[in-house]
Amino acid sequence: MVLLLTIHLSCTDNEGTLEKRLAVRPQHIERLQKLDDEGRLVAAGAMPKDPNDPQAGFYGSTMIVEFDTREALDEWLKEEPFLKEGIYSHVDVKPFNKAFPKG
């Protein structure tokens, strides 16, 4: 049995990237869908500046993902559209120990 690393990604958006974020979003979602299909996506979502006003923009995103190694995660991040297109200013990577929900 391979033990996967569970990793929390806190991704911070650059200011003024809402339009670009929305344009690139389908590519970003496609990659997350692939991780989900492979059973390696624990959770993912955007962090809106105002949950009632989509035009307010985003602070960034949170993703909790599973990879075999840190190197595999780094390779995956190299192709992340939000990073490649300059939407994310940076990504903080930290280990994550899932406690709940069980299963």
Give the ranges of each region predicted by the language model.
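Conserved, structured core segments of small domains
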Residues: 1-103
